Swiss-Prot record:
Signal peptide positions on this chain: 1-39
Low complexity biased stretches: 96-116
Family annotation (PROSITE patterns): TGF_BETA_2
Protein name: Artemin
Cellular-component GO terms for this entry: extracellular space
Main location: secreted
Positions of the propeptide segment: 40-111
UniProt entry keywords in alphabetical sequence: Disulfide bond, Glycoprotein, Growth factor, Secreted, Signal
Family: Belongs to the TGF-beta family. GDNF subfamily.
Length: 224
């Protein structure tokens, strides 16, 4: 029997399985790569929920690639903030320095306090009204009484109230240029004297009320 072209031969039946077995691994790898590429480029284009509207966040694809690798989205990478340089520690607090205005105010306050104390001392030594309890029998008015009354009087210096006459008189007396009369000496400053008076009443030993006018001072001044 002759071998014809139209009939399959034993040689063609032997070559066909070898050719198909050689191409099958290549086709399988190409199909797998095509699926992985489509999934990585547009993982949600095939999902009907993505076309209909917003949907909950889906988990990233975890398809395994050839060689044991796993596909990941770029959005999963977390951007870490750049490291910040350490801030220098603040210097320790030093002793508080007093500012010049505060120092000036303190000095002025000290001077003002000194002046006020001097003024108080001068006022205490100056002409002013004073009072004291005294017995009526010691007044020298001829009344017999066991009572005590408050007697007000004036005392103190009037140097600050001196006039030009008083200053010149004191200078002449100090230089010996002015001869004073025998047994007397001129006064070179005013005298602290009462300027107003009041009456005082008391009871004597006979239980009789006595009133003395212009007995006690109520105001003082430098006179002369």
């Amino acid at each position: 029997m002759e071998l014809g072209l139209a009939e399959p031969t034993a040689l063609s039946h032997c070559l066909r399985p070898r050719w198909q077995s050689a191409w099958w691994p290549t086709l399988a790898v190409l199909a797998l790569l095509s699926c992985v590429t489509e999934a990585s480029l547009d993982p949600m284009s095939r999902s009907p929920a993505a076309r209909d509207g917003p949907s909950p966040v889906l988990a990233p694809p975890t398809d395994h690639l050839p060689g044991g690798h796993t596909a990941h989205l770029c959005s999963e990478r977390t951007l870490r903030p750049p490291p910040q340089s350490p801030q220098p520690a603040p210097p320790p607090p030093g002793p508080a320095l007093q500012s010049p205005p505060a120092a000036l105010r303190g000095a002025r306050a000290a001077r003002a306090g000194t002046r006020s104390s001097r003024a108080r001392t001068t006022d205490a030594r100056g002409c002013r009204l004073r009072s004291q309890l005294v017995p009526v029998s010691a007044l020298g008015l001829g009344h017999s009484s066991d009572e005590l009354i408050r007697f007000r009087f004036c005392s103190g210096s009037c140097r600050r109230a001196r006039s030009q006459h008083d200053l010149s008189l004191a200078s002449l007396l100090g230089a010996g240029a002015l001869r004073s009369p025998p047994g007397s000496r001129p006064i070179s400053q005013p005298c602290c004297r009462p300027t107003r008076y009041e009456a005082v009443s008391f009871m004597d030993v006979n239980s009789t009320w006595r009133t003395v006018d212009h007995l006690s001072a109520t105001a003082c001044g430098c006179l002369g």
